[in-house]
Every structure is written in C-alpha cells, then in structure tokens.
Amino acid sequence: MVQLSKTGVRDTLKAGHPPAVKAGGKRVVKKSADENANVEKETRKTDKPRSVLAPSRMQHLSLLLSGPLEKLGHDFPETPVSVRHSRVRPSVEKPHISRIPCIQQPRKF
C-alpha cells in the first residue's frame, strides 16, 4: 500500500508503519525524526541537578558511615591465614575398611 506522508513524499507502508531495515543481520525499525525529537525534549525537561545535597542529608550520611569506618580499624589476629583455613584434624581416626569384592548382584543395605 502506498500513501502520501505529511511532506508529500510517497512512502511504502507495511501494516501501517514503515518497513524494517536490516542492520548487522537483524531487522531494525527505522523511527521517524519527529518521534526522536519528542523524546529528547522530554528528557531535557526531567533533568534535575543531582550534585547538590541538602545539609541534613549529608549529616545523615556521615552518621551512617561513622559506624562501619570504626569497625575497619580493628587489629588482625596474629595467627597465619593458612593455619586458620586448614582442614580440621579429627580426634579419632576412622578405621581403614578393606575393599569389598565386586559382586554381580545388587546388595541390600
């Protein structure tokens, strides 16, 4: 179906919208410049300066950070890390079990 656009140029429309363009092996929809301009105007209106913080919020933030900063100043234990992460030796060793011969039938346990 061929229709005239607002500018008077003939565009081919498929299902009421312009056909997709292949880019990089995938089909990508071409958006008109009018739609992109509206989106940019809306984003400019919603931008607010975020760098300025209220003084009360800064004080609240410093109170939150004061606790964890004090905890980071603790002394580390003198035992080496390899000793702390080594496997625990059992107090009683398990007896060595001799190998059970292979039986061709299922066993009940």
Swiss-Prot record:
Region Disordered: which residues? 1-51, 76-100
Pfam families under this entry?
DAP
The UniProt entry's GO biological process terms, in alphabetical order, are: apoptotic signaling pathway; negative regulation of autophagy; ribosome hibernation
**What ranges does the record list as Basic and acidic residues composition bias?**
31-50
An example Gene Ontology molecular-function term: translation repressor activity
Q: What keywords is this UniProt entry annotated with?
A: Translation regulation
Q: Spell out the subunit comment.
A: Associates with ribosomes; preventing translation. Interacts with eiF5a (eif5a and eif5a2); preventing translation.
State the protein's purpose.
Ribosome-binding protein that promotes ribosome hibernation, a process during which ribosomes are stabilized in an inactive state and preserved from proteasomal degradation. Acts via its association with eiF5a (eif5a and eif5a2) at the polypeptide exit tunnel of the ribosome, preventing mRNA translation. Plays a key role in ribosome hibernation in the mature egg by preventing mRNA translation, leading to ribosome inactivation. Ribosomes, which are produced in large quantities during oogenesis, are stored and translationally repressed in the egg and early embryo.
Family membership: Belongs to the DAP-DAPL1 family.
The entry's protein name is: Death-associated protein-like 1 homolog
